[in-house]
């Protein structure tokens, strides 16, 4: 007799979601209209607040997670989740700048508090090692709002020509293009095919022994430099120095989280949760890492932003403070608070100056690091371990590991992200 085939039990298909329904963090179907229902953590928090009792940190985290999960907008095939961190800049920035334009003292208080609040939020998220769209939202909305104030309050006064407006608009467009390019893949490392899972010596060598062609020659990997007065021949071959140095170094090159062997200068970003080739740092302003593939676009975005910002500041000051130099008008502009339009423009100028000064500092640090062929992660590591050569009170840090001279360092930076032709190790001097 033929064996009777058992019929497979068909799983019931999930019904499509309507525009107001969604799957919550518990895996259950929920509705936007029920966002205020079943809020036990919020009820507990309100009760403890009304009775003057301290709120436990885990309760605050659960309340935040619940709010962020239920904050959604109706959309096709289910309600879409709105990241709550993008909302504060959209609401607070226009309100605070308009309040600051009421009086000189209010402007001092508000413009002093804004950087402090931003730094506090940065250290809060940095300590928790989590991604946030707050700074990206703040940057993009600041660009848009400054441009809006310029069109509404400065251009109608008739002192800005069409060519100047077109040049400023072009600069803003180029900033957005460079930011889009900088937010793309910074050079994430893919996991090589290897079945071994633990970072023992034999298992670390597995990707090289079994699939040397796979791990060999990562695109754009730094292939030259001097370490202890000798050339890194293994870097010239495009592979990590695993299996050739000490076991301690082999374990250092192995990433237990990504289960791969990192090439030279690559590092695991704890915020993004992945390894990045030639990682410089994690930039909160683009909510992404700055690595081998997007470092050039990051520098380009900074340079265009600085030029456009300085140009916009000069146009605004020449309009609201006539017949005065830029530096004098920035600190002494009599009658600027006489009307609302000039007061708001002057407040936005000072806000732009604060942002521009911060970006100029980042740009200066980047130029110094590129000139010495070091990444920001290598600089911080050298400062912690008290290694390398420090100049100008630590502003300049030269590890001496990859420094090949000013021109060669910039030439190497200009070719980041391109697939280079590796020369034999015997030809490298």
UniProtKB/Swiss-Prot annotation:
What would be one Pfam family of this protein?
A: DHHC
Q: What spans does the record annotate as topological domain Lumenal, numbered to this chain?
A: 103, 152-159, 318-347
| Subunit structure, interactors included | Interacts with NOS1.
Transferase recorded as keyword: yes
Q: What does this protein do?
A: Palmitoyltransferase that could catalyze the addition of palmitate onto various protein substrates and be involved in a variety of cellular processes. Palmitoyltransferase that mediates palmitoylation of KCNMA1, regulating localization of KCNMA1 to the plasma membrane. May be involved in NOS1 regulation and targeting to the synaptic membrane.
Q: Where is this region: Disordered?
A: 212-247
Q: Which reaction does it catalyse?
A: L-cysteinyl-[protein] + hexadecanoyl-CoA = S-hexadecanoyl-L-cysteinyl-[protein] + CoA
**What is this protein's record name?**
Palmitoyltransferase ZDHHC23
Any keyword Chaperone? Answer: no
Interaction with NOS1: region residues: 426-429
């Amino acid at each position: 007799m033929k064996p009777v085939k058992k019929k497979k039990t068909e799983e019931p298909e999930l019904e499509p979601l309507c525009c107001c329904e969604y799957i919550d963090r518990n895996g259950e179907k929920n509705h936007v209209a029920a966002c205020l229902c079943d809020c036990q953590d919020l009820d507990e928090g309100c009760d403890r607040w009304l009775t003057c009792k301290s709120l436990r940190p885990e309760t605050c985290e659960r309340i935040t997670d619940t709010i962020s999960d239920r904050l959604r907008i109706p959309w096709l095939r289910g309600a879409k989740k709105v990241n709550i961190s993008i909302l504060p800049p959209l609401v607070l920035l226009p309100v605070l700048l308009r309040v600051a334009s009421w009086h000189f003292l209010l402007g001092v208080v508000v413009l002093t508090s804004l950087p402090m609040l931003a730094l506090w939020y940065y250290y809060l998220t940095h300590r928790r090692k989590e991604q946030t769209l707050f700074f990206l939202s703040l940057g993009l909305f600041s660009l848009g709002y400054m441009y809006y104030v310029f069109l509404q309050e400065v251009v109608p006064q008739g002192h800005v020509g069409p060519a100047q407006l077109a040049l400023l608009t072009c600069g803003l467009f180029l900033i957005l293009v460079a930011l889009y390019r900088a937010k793309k893949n910074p050079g994430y490392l893919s996991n090589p095919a290897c079945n071994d899972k633990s970072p023992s010596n034999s298992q670390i060598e597995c990707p090289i022994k079994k699939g040397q062609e796979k791990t060999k020659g990562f695109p754009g990997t730094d292939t030259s430099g001097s370490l202890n007065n000798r050339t890194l021949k293994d870097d010239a071959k495009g592979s990590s120095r695993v299996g050739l140095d000490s076991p301690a170094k082999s374990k250092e090159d192995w990433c237990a989280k990504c289960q791969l062997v990192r090439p030279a200068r690559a590092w695991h970003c704890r915020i993004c949760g992945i390894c990045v080739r030639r990682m410089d740092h994690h930039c909160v302003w683009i909510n992404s890492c700055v690595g081998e593939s997007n470092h050039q676009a990051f520098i380009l975005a900074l340079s265009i932003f600085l030029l456009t910002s300085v140009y916009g500041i000069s146009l605004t000051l020449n309009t609201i403070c006539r017949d005065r130099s830029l530096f004098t008008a920035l600190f002494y502009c009599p009658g600027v608070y006489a009307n609302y339009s000039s007061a708001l423009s002057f407040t936005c100028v000072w806000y732009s100056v604060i942002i521009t000064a911060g970006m100029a500092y980042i740009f200066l640090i980047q130029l110094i690091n590129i000139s010495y062929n070091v990444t920001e992660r290598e600089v911080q590591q050298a400062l912690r371990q008290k290694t390398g050569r420090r100049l100008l009170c630590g502003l300049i840090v030269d590890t001496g590991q990859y420094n090949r001279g000013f021109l060669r360092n910039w030439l190497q930076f200009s070719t980041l992200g391109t697939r280079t032709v590796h020369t034999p190790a015997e030809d490298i001097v």
